[in-house]
Amino acid sequence: MTNPIIAFQNVSKVFEDSGTQVLKDINFELEEGKFYTLLGASGSGKSTILNIIAGLLDATSGDVLLDGKRINDIPINKRDVHTVFQSYALFPHMNVFDNVAFALKLKKVPKKEIEERVKEALKMVQLDGYQKRSIQKLSGGQRQRVAIARAIINQPRVVLLDEPLSALDLKLRTEMQYELRELQKRLGITFVFVTHDQEEALAMSDWIFVMNDGEIVQSGTPVDIYDEPINHFVATFIGESNILPGVMIEDYLVEFNGKRFESVDGGMRPNEPVEVVIRPEDLQITLPEEGKLQVRVETQLFRGVHYEIIAYDNLGNEWMIHSTRKAIEGEIIGLDFMPEDIHIMRLNETEEEFDARIEEYVEMEEPEDGLIHAIEEERHEENS
């Protein structure tokens, strides 16, 4: 990574009135011009990180850096960041122009320059011509665009977005996801986006930080996190998963459901207990005798693009299958999957331990025939 625009170094936060620790030794670096997402459930600490970057909250310990300089004691108005809040925080008595121009007027920017910059900012969010429109007469999506225009008009280095799409209906929220992502690419500004919506994070981000209980439990590209969840929490929080107990017999061979299957994972102890993850969309329905597993269909729901089928094997394990084929409740079906569809999770492994294990294992492999090496090389190229 080039010099990070934002960095957290061992940042913790404790609310003194309650004694609650909401951030625990947080470390990360943000590169300029990328779209980052802090993803987690309510109370995970994601908004606290955003507020510390903005200067709305102080870190209890640790350092917050902007362009390599410590900004813990720098006031809000001296930080080159701008926040878009969930409520948008627009002035209802002002029209669109005055809302967007507010900060420029405070800085006593010349009137002609204000008009030009407001017009350009509104054009960026497809609201040029709305300058005289009352805020009260705008739709939710239009108010969102005004808030974003106000955020970018000062050309900040970083834009912070605190669940800005959560109040919108599904269709409008999806449209705004596209618009926000395209806007960020055009501007080249670092966006830090907070959400509890996994699909939103996967769709928009260059890099995701998954948070739980004040800690970053995994970070990576959307593809990395979806395809290689680090633990049970991430696997269940990001998308739907079938998770079963298993045993890693040896490299590339795992046992679950009383059977042994080829996999693409290695670097673990022989006969080590693990958890096995197979995504619902990676399961193919076959004739019972042709499947690697046999299950009985319990129920199904039509989700528009696929049927969501719930089935049980003879050990009582529940299986979720996403299929374009409609099943018959009560029928026995076969399930087929490929070795690369099987994702192995060590029990209670941290992200640091995972990275160290993979690095050590790759060094042991021959480059020309090392499967793990090839996978890691591919992931490295995708992240470059």
From Swiss-Prot:
The top EC class, named as a word, is translocase
Tell me the membrane topology, using the record's own terms.
Peripheral membrane protein
The record's Pfam families line, in alphabetical order, gives:
ABC_tran, TOBE_2
Example of a GO MF term:
ABC-type polyamine transporter activity
Record keywords: Ribonucleoprotein included?
Answer: no
Recorded catalytic activity of this chain's protein: ATP + H2O + polyamine-[polyamine-binding protein]Side 1 = ADP + phosphate + polyamineSide 2 + [polyamine-binding protein]Side 1
What is one GO cellular-component annotation here? ATP-binding cassette (ABC) transporter complex
Oligomeric form and interacting partners: The complex is composed of two ATP-binding proteins (PotA), two transmembrane proteins (PotB and PotC) and a solute-binding protein (PotD).
User: What does the record give as the function of this protein?
Assistant: Part of the ABC transporter complex PotABCD involved in spermidine/putrescine import. Responsible for energy coupling to the transport system.
Q: What is stated as this protein's family in its record?
A: Belongs to the ABC transporter superfamily. Spermidine/putrescine importer (TC 3.A.1.11.1) family.
Per its record, how is this protein called by name?
Spermidine/putrescine import ATP-binding protein PotA
Which source organism?
Streptococcus thermophilus (strain ATCC BAA-250 / LMG 18311)
Q: Mind giving the lineage of the organism this protein is from?
A: Bacteria, Bacillati, Bacillota, Bacilli, Lactobacillales
